[in-house]
Amino acid sequence: MKVYINVYDLMPDSPVNKLAWTLGLGIYHTGLVLEGKEYAFGAHEIPGSTGVFATMPRPPLEGCRWRCSIALPNCTLPKPDVDRILIRLSQEFTGLSYSLLERNCNHFTNAAAIELTGSPIPSFLNRISRIGLAFPTITNALLQHGQKNTSDVDDSSDSSSDVDEETLIVSKSKKAHKDIPKFSAPPPSADLNNLITDSLP
């Protein structure tokens, strides 16, 4: 079976974005394509439910644009084994377990790629999360600055409720850096209409 990754750019098209792409420092969403379906991972607030969903390849995604496709080695596993792997991964990657820095769509794509092809995704696709974890104080300062600028533009949001928000620097990172303030942001959403269950769509 042919396997490839669709890469989507989360940064607006600009000279800075072009430089980030050249340096491998962009912010990307990825999905793994297998047998005409694209499998990806996103966040939602349904307890015990997967965040893995399947769509047609290159679906329209709000806030990002398709950048390229990257071929992986072929998957030589029998179809029942492929289905079992995808179902198991969908149980491990729940919507509530999503973390922008420690468990994002690229982590799922990498796990699926390794299990199905024996090959990881290119490291630049998730480099920004590794940088964010290595420098959590700087990451939070930058993100809080961005959040402040966003709230200056739209002050209609109710800051007292963070039910739909998610902490960017999670507890494991905070243990090493206790002075990091909490910063919350809405995580990317899973396609709730196409979640993987005990059988593949």
Swiss-Prot record:
Question: Biological process GO terms, please?
Answer: meiotic cell cycle; proteolysis
Q: Per the record, where are the segments of Acidic residues compositional bias?
A: 152-167
Supply the EC number(s): 3.4.-.-
Give its localization: Cytoplasm
* Region Disordered, residue ranges: 146-201
Gene3D superfamilies linked: PPPDE domains (3.90.1720.30)
GO MF terms here are: deubiquitinase activity
Would the keyword Protease turn up in this protein's UniProt record? Answer: yes
Which keywords appear in this protein's UniProt record, sorted alphabetically?
Answer: Cytoplasm, Hydrolase, Meiosis, Protease
Compositional bias segments (type: Polar residues)? 191-201
Ranges of residues in domain PPPDE: 1-143
Cellular component (GO) terms are:
cytosol
Tell me, in one coarse class, where this protein mainly resides: cytoplasm
Keyword Hydrolase found: yes
Under the heading InterPro entries, the entry gives:
PPPDE_dom (IPR008580), PPPDE_sf (IPR042266)
* Active site (record annotation): 29, 105
**Transmembrane intervals:** none
- The record's disulfide annotation reads none
**EC class (word):** hydrolase
Q: What does this protein do?
A: Has a role in meiosis.
List, alphabetically, the PANTHER family matched. Answer: DESUMOYLATING ISOPEPTIDASE (PTHR12378), IP06716P-RELATED (PTHR12378:SF80)
Q: Which family does it belong to?
A: Belongs to the DeSI family.
Record-given protein name: DeSI-like protein sdu1
